[in-house]
């Protein structure tokens, strides 16, 4: 069942869910906790690659990904990152989140931002039980105007569901976890898929 604001506060108080820095009471509403935008981004560089073969040999795929993905971009707190129409960028939340093995989290974008064309996650909005780290945001601007995104702005909301039991393989204990303890906007690691 989805956790209510009262249950979320209890989980934060007893350390079942850890959000660092801990959100203020004003960030917790009926069934969610607001999260803010961090200061790290990654974008797709201009490139001449005609495509990326997502089922090709891992080494070739990694070379193509390295060629098109930028290094980490750090934005100062008083500056903005501009996301232009049709662009995809990666970023991270300001907050780091730790979930136990019996709670799954979900990231939702804000309706007010979606009405301007901003998608906060392209498809990956589940936060696995056992997750520990910052949440990567997959921004896409489907609107007509560039959007200025500033570190610290409220960018989305997390909600949580308690599972019927703890999972047998929490995210942070699996050897195959590609984004374990993530603290920055990590590029796709699809080439590590088995």
Swiss-Prot record:
Belongs to the dCTP deaminase family. Catalyzes the deamination of dCTP to dUTP. This is dCTP deaminase. DCTP binds at residues 110-115, 128, 136-138, 171, 178, 182. GO terms for molecular function: dCTP deaminase activity; nucleotide binding. Disulfide bonds: none annotated. Keywords: Hydrolase, Nucleotide metabolism, Nucleotide-binding. Residues 174-194 are annotated as: Disordered. The active site is at 138 (proton donor/acceptor). It holds the Pfam family DCD. GO terms for biological process: dUMP biosynthetic process; dUTP biosynthetic process; nucleobase-containing small molecule interconversion. Homotrimer. It catalyses: dCTP + H2O + H(+) = dUTP + NH4(+). Its EC number is 3.5.4.13. Pathway: Pyrimidine metabolism; dUMP biosynthesis; dUMP from dCTP (dUTP route): step 1/2. Gene3D superfamilies: 2.70.40.10. It is an enzyme of class 3 (hydrolase).
